[in-house]
């Protein structure tokens, strides 16, 4: 799952960082796991923010299975006051046994955030079908166009038991002010027949910006999600760090969430703002396995340095390192602001090859337009590879 954000507090140039207490927490009744239709162990839950301040939170999930322990973490989208944020982790390493969930850990820091102004339409168009899937509409109630929108929700049984976290099948490219767009959600097949209703609908958006710098005479690509302006990026091979000029014109602190290729570091990042070391949130994306490093930038002009890169890493100049299966299919099929090649698509899907016939792209475009789940499309492409059509 790609991580989607909306917007983070700087105190004396340090991050106000907490281990979650009663105000930001995961209720026991909203935290569980099951084996999904692919036979992999899935853990779902929801973080509640009962504080009066918006927060950016990191969730760490740990599962014991026999003599083995598995742990994953993720930085979630910002959570507004009195709101929930659903999440889901997949553990492909766990396909059997009797997994035991440990108590989840939640760390967070307070932040500021501009409203997304995307509202779910709670009317007769919000419909659940007998097979468990749901369709509905969201409306842009703001004054500016919003791009790359996803909707998250929790599903429940008729006994009000939480069953799973779900999200819309495909990212909505954009919604202009006053317009609406349809979204479709499919629960996992193993629990679909038990679904009685959906709750906690949360829209989110990814407006990350691609950046690059020279490292070892190669172009090193990374990205950042922030309304803070970052310029003059430079990689220093002596300190294995990237420096930036940061400009926050807003008279309040906002967060920056950087994403780096997984092989570029072991995760031991250090962040300095104006020479002062701060404590960032650090996690590895559950789908792409890329690193996320998030922290706040206060009002005004600042010098930022991110250190902790692996000196032995050689940038592979992959401009689209951050793509997961869904975003790769969208880009390849022409539903994005950029397109990728057949070989890049197949690489992201884990398929060896470099050629996909044009008629397959047309078919995939049709399937995406009609909200066919991404897993189904990937399986079809893999079948075409086995049949010798994809080469």
Go through the PLM ranges and name each one.
Residues 247-267:
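Surface-exposed beta-strand/loop patches in extracellular or lumenal glycoproteins
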Residues 52-57, 145-148, 162-164:
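Short acidic/proline- and small/hydrophobic-mixed sequence motifs that coincide with surface turns
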Residues 76, 91-133, 165, 171, ...:
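Terminal connector regions
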Residues 1-27, 59-61, 136, 271, ...:
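Secretory targeting signatures
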Residues 92-98, 191-194, 285-313:
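C-terminal beta-strand-rich structural cap/linker in extracellular carbohydrate-active enzymes
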Residues 77-84, 172-180, 283-288, 296-298:
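Short proline/glycine- and polar residue-rich coil/turn motifs
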Residues 313-391:
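Acidic, Ser/Pro/Thr-rich low-complexity regulatory regions
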Residues 47-51, 138-143, 246-248:
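Asparagine-centered strand-capping/turn motif at beta-strand->loop junctions
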